[in-house]
């Protein structure tokens, strides 16, 4: 018996990295999973990798029309949601004196605004007793130089969780934040050279980056009844980086 048997999960940004690993694990544990992403090729590849009990919807989590289409698809195919993982996000470096309006708006547009409206538009379909969690970042805890916009856009999510759990308590919907540190994903490979990756690893007490599957197991915990008494919390999964 799987931990998510009969459940319906929606994962934004579910076409790569830790969210894709989570989507695959959720299906293995009995869920039907809806994943969304902007790039059709990546969406098709993710569906093929997961292999079963998955529906892909192309769209941008910062675009409200795309969000409407995502949840209309969920409504037509399954009628309700038990788990929502908002993992669509973006970020780039920028020194304080060089941050542009476009940089700020695009980062907050997806990480903060997109997250809020994803949750808002999911709520009419949500079963009471469900689980919502958002992907944070330990950048909001560590103060890495040149990451102020990204860090601030992720810190928003802890505030969301604290407020929303109060608003949703009568429906027994839990709201948490899953906060990874450095994880070896295709995005990391794209953003950072080997020297930068080695520098990041030097900050991690265990000496190596995390793997998507290590984050996925924590996501499964938050999605399942194993975390039934966990609400309004930020679970930091970064190999101890934020603690030292």
What function would you assign to each model-found segment?
Residues 8, 15-16:
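Conserved glycine-rich cofactor-binding loop
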Residues 85, 169, 174, 230-232:
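Short, small/polar-rich loop/turn modules that mediate ligand/substrate recognition or access, typified
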Residues 95-96, 100-108, 188, 200:
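Substrate-binding pocket helix/loop in short-chain dehydrogenase/reductase
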């Amino acid at each position: 018996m799987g931990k998510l048997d009969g459940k319906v999960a929606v994962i934004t940004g579910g076409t790569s990295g830790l969210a894709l690993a989570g989507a695959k694990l959720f299906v293995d544990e009995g869920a039907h999973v809806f994943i969304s992403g902007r790039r059709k090729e990546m969406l098709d590849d993710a569906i093929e990798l997961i292999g079963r009990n998955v529906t892909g919807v192309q769209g941008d989590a910062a675009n409200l029309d795309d969000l409407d289409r995502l949840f209309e698809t969920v409504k037509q195919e399954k009628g309700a949601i038990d788990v929502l993982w908002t993992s669509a996000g973006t970020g780039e470096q920028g020194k304080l004196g060089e941050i542009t309006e476009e940089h700020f708006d695009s980062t907050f547009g997806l990480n903060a605004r997109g997250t809020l409206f994803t949750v808002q538009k999911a709520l009419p379909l949500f079963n009471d007793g469900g689980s919502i969690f958002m992907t944070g970042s330990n950048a909001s805890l560590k103060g890495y130089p040149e990451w102020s916009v990204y860090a601030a856009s992720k810190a928003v999510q802890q505030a969301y969780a604290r407020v929303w759990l109060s608003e949703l308590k009568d429906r027994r919907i839990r709201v948490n934040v899953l906060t990874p540190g450095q994880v070896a994903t295709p995005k990391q490979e794209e953003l950072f050279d080997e020297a930068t990756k080695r520098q990041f690893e030097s900050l991690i007490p265990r000496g190596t980056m995390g793997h998507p599957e290590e984050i996925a197991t924590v996501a499964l915990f938050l999605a399942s009844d194993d975390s039934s008494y966990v609400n309004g919390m930020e679970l930091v999964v970064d190999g101890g980086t934020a603690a030292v």
